[in-house]
């Protein structure tokens, strides 16, 4: 099953397969969550283990990899000179459903915008790069750190990259936001440049990069896959704002062009 990345305020534990229409409220310091009757929410990790979690993913042994913001809000042009964001590996040592041990798996990252555990490595998107971290001796600290993909752009809002996501076809997918110009070496088309938004995919060795979708939307944010392998993408500014419309979901058919008219599509 492809893991979904989500903010780690809480992790929901499903207690019943079928829920009734009744609702239950669970109150936490961060707010109140309302769920259908028969579902429960428990805090799986909180301070001091994690303070500002951004994304999570599990490995095959149930250990949790949490990307965390350092809390800085200085401009990205300054952040990139001394990146301060981190990745933690959390372990539930006694099996009670609450994580109780932490190691700093990786540090010195730009703002994390996605994470994916795949075949023994953790892929983390931190514009302008997607990193591949590997902990060969399993001590909870990644000793191997390599740039899996380098977009070579970093805009003020850092929408240059989102992802990565594992497709049903075994490829690794990621999103490019508009409107920075990036250059890709595509099979048979080296030096291909684009300012448009895209979904891209590649093999896990980063070879055979190809665009899956092209668009005039501002910021493709997330991609999920149906059991049949169909791609569903969420994005901001799918259409020009007006009449209560702006963001949207797209059934991302291979080779499709979507979103509002924009000069980046010319």
What name fits each language-model region?
Residues 24-266:
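Beta-propeller blade termini and top-face loops
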Residues 1-4:
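N-terminal secretory signal peptides that target proteins for export/translocation
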Residues 7-19:
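Bacterial N-terminal signal peptides
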């Amino acid at each position: 099953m492809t893991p979904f990345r989500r903010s780690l305020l809480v992790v929901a534990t499903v207690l019943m397969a079928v829920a009734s229409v009744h609702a239950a409220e669970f109150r936490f310091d961060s707010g109140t969550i309302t769920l259908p009757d028969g579902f429960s929410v428990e805090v799986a990790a909180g301070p001091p283990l994690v303070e500002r979690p951004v994304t999570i993913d599990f490995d095959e042994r149930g250990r949790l990899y949490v990307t965390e913001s350092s809390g800085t809000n200085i401009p990205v042009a300054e952040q990139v000179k001394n990146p301060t964001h981190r990745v933690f590996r959390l372990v539930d040592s006694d099996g009670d459903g609450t994580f109780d041990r932490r190691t700093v798996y990786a540090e010195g990252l730009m703002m994390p915008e996605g994470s994916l555990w795949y075949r023994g490595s953790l892929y983390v998107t931190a514009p302008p790069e997607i990193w591949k971290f590997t902990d060969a001796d399993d001590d909870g600290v990644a000793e191997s750190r390599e740039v899996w993909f380098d977009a070579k752009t970093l805009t003020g809002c850092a929408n240059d990259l989102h992802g990565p996501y594992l497709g049903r076809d075994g490829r690794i997918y990621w999103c490019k936001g508009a409107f920075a110009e990036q250059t890709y070496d595509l099979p048979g088309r080296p030096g291909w440049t684009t300012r448009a938004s895209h979904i891209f995919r590649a093999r896990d060795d980063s070879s055979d990069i190809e665009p899956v979708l092209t668009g005039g939307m501002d910021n493709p944010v997330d991609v999920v896959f149906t059991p049949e392998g169909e791609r569903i993408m969420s994005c901001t500014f799918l259409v020009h704002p007006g009449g209560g419309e702006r963001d949207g979901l797209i059934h991302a058919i291979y080779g499709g062009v979507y979103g509002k008219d924009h000069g980046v599509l010319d």
